[in-house]
Amino acid sequence: VQWTAEEKQLITGLWGKVNVAECGGEALARLLIVYPWTQRFFASFGNLSSPTAVLGNPKVQAHGKKVLTSFGEAVKNLDSIKNTFSQLSELHCDKLHVDPENFRLLGDILVVVLAAHFGKDFTPDCQAAWQKLVRVVAHALARKYH
């Protein structure tokens, strides 16, 4: 994947302002609420019976932070995202058996969360750069499946 200097700047510039715990928790919670079939991968998280339960679940918040912290590795390593996520791809494919489509869904939700948090600072150019990034990350995570 080739990144323009502008794309890199838009991604890293916004990333520097992201509250990883808040945005990560919100993104994972939204995934579980909007696409409830994804909850089956999180049975050990306890009560996910309603949007209120999901949003208030500390395990959802903690794992969301973990997911977005990991996503930060992509931001730091834009030129080697496949290598950055090779072990996570293996884990999600071989051990957890996660449908790779879920990576795309979570990426799209992350873009929604960033747009909600950053409003007018999340310009169309910024959105395009982030949409490209979440696609590249989703593809890297799904790599072990191919």
Swiss-Prot record:
It comes from Passer montanus (Eurasian tree sparrow). The gene is HBB. GO terms for cellular component: blood microparticle; haptoglobin-hemoglobin complex; hemoglobin complex. One of its GO terms (molecular function) is organic acid binding. One of its GO terms (biological process) is hydrogen peroxide catabolic process. Involved in oxygen transport from the lung to the various peripheral tissues. PANTHER family: HEMOGLOBIN FAMILY MEMBER, HEMOGLOBIN SUBUNIT EPSILON. It comes from the Eukaryota. This is Hemoglobin subunit beta. Heterotetramer of two alpha chains and two beta chains. Red blood cells. Keywords: Heme, Iron, Metal-binding, Oxygen transport, Transport. Pfam families: Globin. The lineage of its organism: Eukaryota, Metazoa, Chordata, Craniata, Vertebrata.
